[in-house]
């Protein structure tokens, strides 16, 4: 059993790490906490994988947005970032994201991955208003968003 505070700590450590690489972050986490039926090692690996992808493919000119909430016995964390133009066509095995999804399932959680390219029409994808402004930079080819749902006890 873990407190949601542990996830906040993982998020903060990863945000600090990418800040050293030149990224800016916009983090909004409520002060409400809950108890998770989760594994510390898996939670740490999940956020390490997500933020490693941001380091590899993210656009430093657009803030990385992290939001969380607690509703209906679920703790939700959403991480979104803009994708650099030069990485828009880069092929990837997505092994890190597949591992994140597998770990979330092992903890009875869920993951939703959403990618919107600059050529997509507005409203066709599950992208929040905050991430849509990421297209302001001409070096950005799209927005990548991962939503994680952790069950609460």
Where do the language-model regions lie?
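Short conserved segments within the C-terminal catalytic ATPase subdomain
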Residues: 17-27
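Conserved micro-motifs of the catalytic ATP-binding
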Residues: 35-38
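A residue-level detector for a conserved hydrophobic packing site
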Residues: 43-44
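Short helix-loop "hinge" at the ATP-lid/N-box region of the Bergerat-fold HATPase_c
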Residues: 54-55
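Short beta-strand/loop element within the Bergerat-fold HATPase_c
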Residues: 61-73
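Glycine-rich/acidic phosphate-handling loop/turn and adjacent ATP-lid/helix
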Residues: 78-95
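Detector for a conserved hydrophobic position within an alpha-helical segment of the HATPase_c
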Residues: 104-105
């Amino acid at each position: 059993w873990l407190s949601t505070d542990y996830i906040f700590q993982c998020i903060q450590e990863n945000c600090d790490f990418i800040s050293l690489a030149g990224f800016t972050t916009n983090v909004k986490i409520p002060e409400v906490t809950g108890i998770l039926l989760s594994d510390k090692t898996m939670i740490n690996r999940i956020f390490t994988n997500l933020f490693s992808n941001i380091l590899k493919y993210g656009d430093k000119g657009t803030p990385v947005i992290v939001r969380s909430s607690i509703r209906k016995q679920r703790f939700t964390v959403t991480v979104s970032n803009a994708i650099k133009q030069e990485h828009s066509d880069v092929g990837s095995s997505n092994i890190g994201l597949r591992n994140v999804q597998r770990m979330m399932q092992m903890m009875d959680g869920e993951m939703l991955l959403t990618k919107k390219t600059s050529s997509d029409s507005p409203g066709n994808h599950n992208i929040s208003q905050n991430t849509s402004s990421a297209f302001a930079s001409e070096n950005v080819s799209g927005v990548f968003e991962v939503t994680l749902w952790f069950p609460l006890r």
